[in-house]
Every structure is written in structure tokens, then in C-alpha cells.
């Protein structure tokens, strides 16, 4: 006999078994436990992801006599794979499938004579090792009369722990009455030696042995040429099927112990030929982690009890009676890539769901669920990285801290130190910092430049002196804004910053105590309202606060001295009851205007300037002029001009306002008496311009005439 070698390829066979008396075929093994079953048992073609299941077929009663000879023939412990071979018939076709599976195939066949029928059984061996391990099987031919059956014995040696063997068979059976198929799939371990491979071979006396050997030799040559092409290696990886979880579990158990373990189920599909050729695909790519089964033959009855039968149908081509390409369920193909990704995780075994008919169906849905479950795991590091970036951003944004500049400035009264400290501590630095940053952002949104440090960039907080804390929403102690227990706390940042990144903050606590004399110091000129209204204006208007803070000294002692001097000025001004604030302001403006003129003019303006010096601390221009010229009050000795000026001012009380269209700055900038003469005629020239508003003309006439009379009388008195 010529040994047959077959590399990386499995194939299916087309056979026509209608001839009964002339066909001689070998058989290796079959069991007689299920021989009493009827031929009417339906055979359905089913395939799992990595396993093949076959329901036990029924055999004729007359075949029981050959059971003893078959059992004696199967004592060899060699590693064998089963394949299908064909008996020469009228149109026997051999067609290789497009999926490579094995690297070597060696078998020798022997035949016996049969009287009326032919019973075919094929034995093949395969090995994944580079060295071609050959195995020989002992094939015997039983004598049957009316049935033609195929009994296939599959044996696969388990190689290294990282290799996996998955096998399947593609067979075809035809008969007039009922074909049957019995496939036993076993895998021995590597410990079986090649010495066991040699078994006794039964030589047949058939005349067609030579033709069969020629057929195998031609097949061997064609297969070796086909396997040399690299396309099969690519298909080896593409046409892979996902292994079931039960097979993975079985492979782990089989690796630990090479001893036989009959408790693990073997999945063998039952295939029905329907008088046509059918195909069962083999997944060679999954052969790296195949299930090494025990080196023993299991009875077909036991296989039927412990095998799950997934429903996967293969297609056949009845016209050509040839094997089609392997067809599996589309879900199985789609999940092939999913199982490859999930192999290293070694998921727990998922038990297949039982059918109403008692069969089990292994579905690939758990693979899809596992993929979906693995998606959030990949997103977890992304979330943690995002949280880290969010945590680091605010730390980079806030690079400066606040530092209170002590002592706190208190205006409008006296407050104990403990109360002031409680008020300051009631407002956290973070809230102040947020409020200041908001104001900067609002100004940028409006298109305004960054505000300079001062009252324009400040935050105000209402404070209750009774609670000694800032008022967030409401306070029961306060009845309104004018309540003496209510105060306003101003927090103003200063431009100086330390090396530590801290910004000094000036804290000013303004008390709303209207009856205090110090409140009159903040009264602006040309204001007819009382001190209470002025305090409300200070609380609401930041521009007023800016003017006030220009005169705040750096230390508390200087501030107290400034308050004392201002109180003295107020006491001096309160003694002159005949002169009100309105003529004082006009007299003060006249003094500033004529300060660069003749000394006579300064002597006349001297007494009035001394009385109006209390208001010189309001604007920067007035304070500079009063400080720069302290000499005019010294030559005031003659009291004669005082009643004249008082007499004149008494007349001009009702006409103290400037004419419309002229500003205080323009009036102050005039330095000589020529400007006064020039201003006598402009009202006449301005009449046609202001004719559209009669009210303005009337007011302008009255105001200009009053001022002209005032200046004329004053100059006449000076000349005299």
C-alpha cells in the first residue's frame, strides 16, 4: 500500500453508493449499540463553532456479527484523523475544498469482500507538526446486505499548549433505502509514540485496489502543489470560526491531564445527505487551541447523550453532486473577530440554551455582549484623564491670592476691633476673588480696557454691625439702608503685589451714621442736598468713592490727623453764619481765578478764601491751588473789604449758577481780567444760536446779568 500524505488541506468527496454487489470498501470501527434503531431516523446537518456532532445512525441487524472483529481492530492507540474516501463508481468525483486543515495525511486501506452491499469507512490521520507523523489504521470490511453506511473515526494529536486542533468532516452518502453516518471524533495526547502507529493491516483481494491507490497518489500530488501557494495560508486565518466557551474550558482541562476524560461532552453534528453531496467546514485557524480529547473511543450512545447540537446548515449542490464551500451562520462569521479579541481574557464557559426538542444550541450572542461590555472598560481611562485635566486647569487659572492690608479703614464712626475682625472673616477670600474677576470679565465683554486698581475695580458687601457679619440675603436687625446698624464694606485691590503672588487688598468699612460731623467732609461742592443724601450717593456711586479714596492716607494715624484738620475747618466755616455754601463756592472760584493777578484783588478775596478752604479737599485741582499759594491770607489786616464782599455776595445768592454752555474748568482756567470783559459780549452773540429754546435764553440772561453786575461792583470797589 502507498501511504498518502496531505498537507494543510481537508477535502470532501463525492460518491455514488448505489452499486451494492461490486463495491468493496474498508471500515475501521463502528459500535453496535445503536444498530437496532430504524433507518427512518432523520439526519440533519449541524455544526458548532469548533466541533462537529453526529447523531448515531442505525445499522442493519445483520451487521451485529461483525462487531467483535471491529472492536479488535480498534486497539491501536495511534493518533488518527478521519476523512472520507470514495469507492470507484460510475461518476466518482474528488473535489478539494478551499480551506486547508492538515499538514500530513497518511493512511492505508484494506478491503474485504462483500456479498450484496457495500459498507464504507474511512480513516485518515493528520498532524500539525512540521515532521509528518504518519499513522496507520486497521480497516476491516463488514458484510452487509441492504444498507450502506460510513463509519468514520477521527483522531487528532494535541501538539503544544498554544496549538489548537479543530476538525470537521465532509461526507456524502447515497442509498436506495436509508443512508447512515456514524462519526466518532477523538483526539489523543502527544504521549502516544510512533511505535504504536504500526498495526496489523488486513490485505484485501479486491481487484480495484490499484485504481484506488492511483487515485490517492494523484490526489497527493495535486494537494502538494496547491498547498505551496500562499493564498491558502491567508485563507487559513480568514475562514476562522469563533470557538465556543465550552471548548475552551475543555481544552484547559485536557492540557492539565492527558488521561482520558469521558465526562466532557464531545460535539458531533449529524449530517443528512438527502441523496446529495454535503459539506461540513473545518476551521483550521482555530486549531491552535483545539480540544485534546482522551485517547479512547466513546460509544455512540454516550455521545448522543452528552453532545449539544447547534443548528447550522450547510448547502449542497445536487446538480454537480460536489462539495460546496463551507457555509455557516452569518452570526458566527461576524463574531469570528470578536472571539479573537476576547481570547486572552478567557471568559467563563457559557452553557448553551436548550431547545424545546431537547437539543442545545450554542449561540454567539455572548461574544457580542462581551464586546459591548468591554467598551466601557476602554472608556474608563479616558474619563480619569479628563478628570485630571479638569483638576489641573483651575489651579493654573488662579495664580494669585489676596492679602488684607491692615489696619482696616473705618469711616463714619468708631467700631470695636473685634467686630471689624468678625466682619472681615465673614467674607472669604475666594468669594472676593471671584467677584473681582467677574468685574474684569464684564468690562472685557463690553469692550472696555482693564480697569485700573481703585474703586472702579472693587466689590461691595452690605454688613450688619449687630450680627458682625456680611449680609448674604436678609437680616432682621436692619430696617433699611439708612439704618445706623447697616454698613458697607468696600474691598479694593491695590496695584502692589508681592513675590509670592499675593495681591494686597485695601478694606474700607463705611458706616451709615448720618449725624456724625465727619460725614460732611465727603460733601461735594454745589450740592444742595444734606449729608444723608450724600452718604447714599457714596454708597451707590463708585465714582464718588474714587474721589474720596484719593485722599485716604496710607496709615491710620495720618487718616486721623486728616480728620482732625477737616473738623477744624468745618468749625471755622460754621462760625460765619451770614455766608452760605453757595456764595462760598463762587467766592472760592473767584479767588482761584484771580490768584495770578494784582495783590489788591487777592487782598479782597482773602477773607472769603479762608472760609471756603473746607471744601478745597474735594477736587485735585482746587487742592493743588490752595496748597501752592499759602501767602495771600497773610496781608489781611483791614476789615473794610469784608462787609463789601459780604454785601455783594448776599445780592448774588440767588444767581450763583454758571450760565449754560460753560463748564467749571473753563471758568477756573481764566486768569486775567480781560477774559471777564470778553465774556460780557458773548451772550449777545449767542442769542441766535439759542433761539430754539426760550427757556434757556431767559435763564442765560438772568445769570449773565447777575454775574456782570457782581463783577462790575467788585471792580469798582477795588478801584476805590
From Swiss-Prot:
Ranges annotated as biased composition (Polar residues): 227-249
Domain of life: Eukaryota
Keyword set includes Nucleus: yes
Region feature (Disordered): 227-250, 264-303, 333-366, 602-640, 678-698
Gene Ontology CC entries for this record: male germ cell nucleus
Cellular location(s): Nucleus
Bias (Pro residues): 630-640
Tissues expressing this chain: Expressed exclusively in testis (at protein level). Within testis, expressed mainly in the intermediate compartment of the seminiferous tubules with weaker expression in the basal and adluminal compartments.
Keywords: Nucleus, Phosphoprotein
Keyword hit for rRNA processing: no
Subunit structure of this chain's protein: Interacts (via C-terminus) with CSNK2A2.
Cited function: May play a role in chromatin regulation of male germ cells.
Entry protein name: Casein kinase II subunit alpha'-interacting protein
Origin species: Mus musculus (Mouse)
Lineage per the UniProt record: Eukaryota, Metazoa, Chordata, Craniata, Vertebrata
Name of the gene this protein is made from: Csnk2a2ip
Amino acid at each position: 500500500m502507498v501511504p498518502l500524505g496531505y498537507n494543510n488541506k481537508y477535502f470532501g468527496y463525492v460518491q455514488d453508493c448505489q452499486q451494492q454487489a461490486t463495491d468493496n470498501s474498508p471500515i475501521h470501527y463502528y459500535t453496535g449499540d445503536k444498530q437496532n434503531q430504524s433507518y427512518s431516523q432523520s439526519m440533519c446537518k449541524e455544526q458548532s463553532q469548533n466541533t462537529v456532532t453526529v447523531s448515531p445512525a442505525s445499522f442493519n441487524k445483520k451487521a451485529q456479527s461483525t462487531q467483535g472483529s471491529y472492536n479488535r481492530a480498534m486497539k491501536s492507540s495511534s493518533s488518527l484523523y478521519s476523512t472520507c474516501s470514495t469507492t470507484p463508481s460510475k461518476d466518482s468525483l474528488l473535489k478539494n475544498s478551499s480551506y486547508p486543515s492538515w499538514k500530513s495525511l497518511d493512511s492505508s486501506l484494506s478491503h474485504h469482500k462483500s456479498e450484496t452491499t457495500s459498507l464504507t469507512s474511512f480513516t485518515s490521520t493528520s498532524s500539525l507538526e512540521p515532521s509528518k507523523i504518519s499513522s496507520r489504521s486497521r480497516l476491516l470490511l463488514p458484510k452487509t446486505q441492504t444498507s450502506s453506511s460510513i463509519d468514520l473515526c477521527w483522531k487528532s494529536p494535541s501538539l503544544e499548549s498554544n496549538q489548537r486542533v479543530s476538525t470537521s468532516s465532509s461526507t456524502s452518502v447515497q442509498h436506495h433505502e436509508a443512508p447512515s453516518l456514524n462519526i466518532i471524533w477523538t483526539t489523543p495526547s502527544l504521549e502516544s509514540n510512533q511505535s504504536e502507529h504500526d498495526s496489523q493491516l488486513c490485505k484485501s483481494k479486491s481487484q480495484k485496489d490499484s485504481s484506488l491507490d492511483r487515485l490517492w497518489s494523484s490526489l497527493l500530488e495535486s494537494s502538494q502543489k496547491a498547498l505551496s501557494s500562499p493564498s491558502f495560508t491567508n485563507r487559513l486565518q480568514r475562514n476562522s470560526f469563533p470557538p465556543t466557551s465550552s471548548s475552551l474550558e475543555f481544552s484547559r482541562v485536557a492540557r492539565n491531564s492527558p488521561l482520558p476524560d469521558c465526562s466532557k461532552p464531545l460535539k458531533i453534528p449529524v449530517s443528512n445527505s438527502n441523496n446529495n453531496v454535503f459539506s461540513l467546514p473545518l476551521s483550521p485557524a482555530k486549531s491552535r487551541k483545539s480540544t485534546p480529547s482522551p485517547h479512547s473511543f466513546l460509544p455512540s450512545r454516550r455521545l448522543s447523550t452528552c453532545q449539544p447540537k447547534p443548528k447550522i446548515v450547510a448547502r449542497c449542490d445536487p446538480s454537480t453532486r460536489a462539495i460546496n464551500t463551507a457555509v455557516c451562520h452569518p452570526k458566527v462569521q461576524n463574531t469570528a473577530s470578536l472571539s479573537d479579541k476576547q481570547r486572552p481574557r478567557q471568559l467563563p464557559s457559557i452553557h448553551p440554551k436548550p431547545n424545546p426538542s431537547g437539543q442545545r444550541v450554542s449561540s454567539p450572542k455572548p461574544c457580542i455582549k462581551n464586546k459591548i461590555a468591554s467598551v466601557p472598560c476602554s472608556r474608563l481611562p479616558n474619563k480619569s484623564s479628563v478628570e485630571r485635566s479638569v483638576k489641573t486647569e483651575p489651579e493654573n487659572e488662579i495664580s494669585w491670592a489676596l492679602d488684607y492690608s491692615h489696619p482696616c479703614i473705618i469711616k463714619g464712626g468708631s467700631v470695636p476691633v473685634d467686630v471689624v475682625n468678625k466682619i472681615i472673616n465673614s467674607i472669604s477670600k475666594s468669594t472676593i476673588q471671584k467677584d473681582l474677576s467677574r468685574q474684569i470679565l464684564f468690562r472685557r465683554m463690553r469692550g472696555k480696557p482693564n480697569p485700573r486698581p481703585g474703586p472702579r475695580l472693587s466689590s461691595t458687601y452690605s454688613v450688619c454691625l449687630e450680627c458682625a457679619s456680611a449680609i448674604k440675603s436678609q437680616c432682621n436687625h436692619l430696617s433699611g439702608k439708612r439704618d445706623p446698624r447697616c454698613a458697607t464694606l468696600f474691598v479694593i485691590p491695590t496695584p502692589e503685589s508681592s513675590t509670592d503672588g499675593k495681591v494686597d487688598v485695601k478694606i474700607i468699612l463705611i458706616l451709615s451714621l448720618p449725624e456724625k460731623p465727619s460725614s460732611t467732609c465727603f460733601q461735594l461742592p454745589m450740592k444742595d442736598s444734606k449729608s444723608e443724601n450724600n452718604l447714599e450717593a457714596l454708597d451707590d456711586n463708585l465714582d464718588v468713592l474714587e474721589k474720596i479714596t484719593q485722599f485716604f492716607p496710607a496709615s491710620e494715624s495720618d487718616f486721623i490727623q486728616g480728620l482732625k484738620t477737616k473738623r477744624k475747618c468745618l468749625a471755622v466755616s460754621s462760625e460765619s453764619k451770614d455766608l452760605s455754601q453757595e456764595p462760598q463756592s463762587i467766592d472760592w472760584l473767584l479767588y482761584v481765578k484771580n490768584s495770578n493777578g494784582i495783590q489788591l484783588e487777592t487782598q479782597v478775596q482773602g477773607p472769603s478764601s479762608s472760609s471756603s478752604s473746607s471744601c478745597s479737599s474735594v477736587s485735585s485741582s482746587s487742592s493743588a491751588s490752595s496748597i501752592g499759594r499759602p501767602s495771600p491770607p497773610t496781608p489781611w489786616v483791614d476789615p473794610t473789604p469784608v462787609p463789601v464782599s459780604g454785601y455783594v455776595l448776599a445780592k448774588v445768592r440767588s444767581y450763583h449758577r454758571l450760565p449754560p454752555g460753560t463748564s467749571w474748568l473753563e471758568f477756573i482756567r481764566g486768569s486775567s481780567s480781560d477774559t471777564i470783559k470778553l465774556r460780557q459780549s458773548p451772550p449777545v452773540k449767542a442769542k441766535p444760536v439759542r433761539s430754539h429754546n426760550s427757556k434757556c435764553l431767559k435763564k442765560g440772561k438772568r445769570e449773565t446779568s447777575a454775574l456782570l453786575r457782581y463783577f462790575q461792583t467788585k471792580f469798582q470797589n477795588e478801584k476805590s
